[in-house]
UniProtKB/Swiss-Prot annotation:
Modified residues (Symmetric dimethylarginine): 4, 6, 8
Organism of origin: Cavia porcellus
Location in the cell: Secreted; Nucleus
Top-level taxonomy: Eukaryota, Metazoa, Chordata, Craniata, Vertebrata
Region (Disordered): 1-21
Alphabetical list of Gene3D superfamilies matching this protein: 2.80.10.50
Molecular function as annotated in GO: growth factor activity; heparin binding; integrin binding
Protein name: Fibroblast growth factor 2
One GO term of the biological process aspect: positive regulation of cell division
PROSITE patterns referenced in this protein's UniProt entry, alphabetically: HBGF_FGF (PS00247)
The keyword Chloroplast belongs to this UniProt entry's keyword annotation: no
Residues joined by cross-link Glycyl lysine isopeptide (Lys-Gly) (interchain with G-Cter in SUMO1): 110
Self-association and partners: Monomer. Homodimer. Interacts with FGFR1, FGFR2, FGFR3 and FGFR4. Affinity between fibroblast growth factors (FGFs) and their receptors is increased by heparan sulfate glycosaminoglycans that function as coreceptors. Interacts with CSPG4, FGFBP1 and TEC. Found in a complex with FGFBP1, FGF1 and FGF2. Interacts with FGFBP3. Interacts with integrin ITGAV:ITGB3; the interaction is required for FGF2 signaling. Interacts with SNORC (via the extracellular domain). Interacts with glypican GPC3.
Residues annotated with Omega-N-methylarginine modification: 4, 6, 8
Binding site for heparin: 51
Length: 170
């Protein structure tokens, strides 16, 4: 499930409807990137944390970390809207989706699962936070060392959970 031109939904998505939409119970989700449209995908960019100056990086082998080099190709990320305020985060070069596992680890999944959706919120300080939809009290976070922080160790008000979305051109 997921990828260009195919339907995207939760692991419980039951059937494909006319026009390529997927039905998940009584909720219909549109294809992630339909032919000739962006399907809720935003222009690729970078996510920089103000804590250590790291860019969130998704590796092709599934690892997730932070790096300070703005030229690293694996920091190019694409947000895809799933619902109002809910996004998935795709590593463009890695062709993988950011996921939070049940033990709080961050990794990159080859396909979209229910662990790949995050509530995106613009905080009062103008930074964004990404809170797991499945594990609702856990956030995407980077430590000052550039390593990801376990979701179970995160919470509101921590600097580690703040990100500044930036254009890939800047």
């Amino acid at each position: 499930v997921g990828g260009r031109g195919r339907g995207r939904g939760t692991a419980a998505a039951a059937r494909r409807e006319p026009g390529g939409a997927m039905a998940a119970g009584s909720i219909t989700t549109l294809p992630a990137l339909p032919e000739g449209g962006d399907g809720g995908a935003f222009a690729p960019g970078h996510f920089k944390d103000p804590n250590g100056g790291f860019f969130l990086r998704i590796h092709p082998d599934g690892r997730v970390d932070g790096v300070r080099e703005k030229t690293d190709p694996h920091i190019k990320l694409q947000l895809q809207a799933e619902d109002r305020g809910v996004v998935s985060i795709k590593g463009v070069c890695a062709n993988r989706y950011l996921a939070m596992k049940e033990d709080g680890r961050l990794l990159a999944s080859k396909c979209v699962t229910d662990e790949c959706f995050f509530f995106e919120r613009l905080e009062s300080n103008n930074y964004n936070t990404y809170r797991s939809r499945k594990y609702s009290s856990w956030y995407v976070a980077l430590k000052r060392t550039g390593q990801y922080k376990l979701g179970s160790k995160t919470g509101p008000g921590q600097k580690a959970i703040l990100f500044l979305p930036m254009s890939a051109k800047s």
